[in-house]
């Protein structure tokens, strides 16, 4: 459970309970690398591939690609479906009030997952899965080609500057929007017990 849920369940909540704290590490931004966090979707919710591609054209330029698409800039996405790759380029100007709305994961969620595929909450929807951008794109391809999933999206990584803007505004990053490296496999945690 998240801290907020635990507070609601704990009628004697004081604020100094363990669930109010988490481990953290500090490092310079030039020592941190953020990779994309790719998406896999199990089905097209009854749509044919041709119908899905046509619906995408409302908000994206859909470009047939002869090779795997690993986006080179913000607001462009790779789509792998039916053994073919497409480059999707978002066609709208963003007039945003909060920085989290400009993130590629937010655009994908709003215009494709919610807008076309009826995936409203990526945290809980059983039809979506995630794969770190640190893994080879062939891993996505094999999951789609083996019919575990119907389609896959590759995303341009969230920048450190975007992450900082979201934090500075007091917002929360959307789920599965960043994959950080380095990961800390082992370490020493110190916790004062009174």
Protein language model annotation of sequence segments:
Residues 1-194:
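Surface-exposed, charge/polar-rich loops and edge strands
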